[in-house]
Curated annotation (Swiss-Prot):
SUPFAM superfamilies: Aldolase (SSF51569)
Stored CDD domains: Transaldolase_TalAB
Subcellular location: Cytoplasm
UniProt keyword Cytoplasm, yes or no: yes
Organism expressing this protein natively: Pseudomonas aeruginosa (strain LESB58)
UniProt family annotation: Belongs to the transaldolase family. Type 1 subfamily.
Gene3D superfamilies hit by this protein: Aldolase class I (3.20.20.70)
Protein name, UniProt field: Transaldolase
GO molecular function, one term: transaldolase activity
Top-level EC class as recorded in UniProt: transferase
Keyword Acyltransferase: no
Keywords: Cytoplasm, Pentose shunt, Schiff base, Transferase
Amino acid sequence: MTSKLEQLKQYTTVVADTGDFDAIARLKPVDATTNPSLLLKAAALPRYAEHLRQATAGSGGDAGLACDRFAVAVGKDILGVIPGRISTEVDARLSFDSEATLARAHRLIELYDEQGIDRERVLIKIASTWEGIRAAEILEREGIQTNLTLLFSFAQAVACADAGVFLISPFVGRIYDWYKKSENRDYVGAEDPGVQSVSRIYRYYKANGYKTVVMGASFRNLGQIEQLAGCDRLTISPDLLQQLADAQGELPRLLLPGEGEPRQVLDESTFRWQMNEDAMATEKLAEGIRLFARDQEKLEYQLATRH
C-alpha cells in the first residue's frame, strides 16, 4: 500500500512549511513556504552561512535589506529543488501600513528578479489585516501574486476572496490551540475548530466560484491533515511530512465542495467589527504578528552583528 503522503498528493497539492533545503529535497513537495521564524532557524544551519555573509555584505548596513536578501537567497535555493512556488514574507512590522507593504513586496520581487527568478514562481506573504489585504489587491493587479497568511477568521477569508488574492493560508493548529486552552478540552477529527474553520472557508469559496487557492497551514497532528485531505493545498512541517511518508493505511478524501454560504462583501467597518467580535481571531492575529516581528528583529540583529 502507498504511504499516506502519496495518497494525500492524489487529492491535494503538498507544500513544505520550512526553510530547510535538505528536508525539502528529501520530501519532494510541489511548493514551499517560509516566514521570519523559519528563516531564523535556517540562519543557524551551516549550509546557509555563505548566504548570510553575502546578504550582509551587499546591504550597506541596512539590516532590513540584509534580511530580504537572505530570504531571497534561501528562496532561490529552494526553487532549485521544487517545481512550484516559494512564499516569501513581508516584514510583519508593516502589517498595518499598505504603502510600506507594497514597497517591501516590490523590493522582494526586484531581488528575485536580480537572481533570475521569474515572479511567477514567487508568492509574497502578507498578514491578513485590512491594510495587508488592500496591499495584496493592488499587487495582484500588478501581476504579483500573494499569499495572505495569519488567517484565523471567516471575515478575513471573505475579504481576501473579494480582493482577488491568489492564495490564503488559514491556520488550523493555532485555532485548535486557542480553543483547547480556552475550553480546557481536546478536539479530534471533524470537531476540531481549526478543521471546521478551513472546511467552512473552502466550501464558501467553491460554492461562490472564487479562484483564490485555500492552503491549510499550521498543523499539530496527522488527524488535522487527514480531515482536510482534498483541500487545494496544505503546507506541512517536515516532521509531519515524514510521519505521513511513514504511515500506512487508507487516507480517503474527506474535504469536498458542498453547500456554502451566500457570497458576501465586507466594507472596512464591517470587517473590523467582525474581527472584534471574534476573540480567537483577534488574539491569534495580534500574537502571530508579534511573533513574526520578534523573529524578524532577531534575524536583523544577527545579520547586523556579523563579523
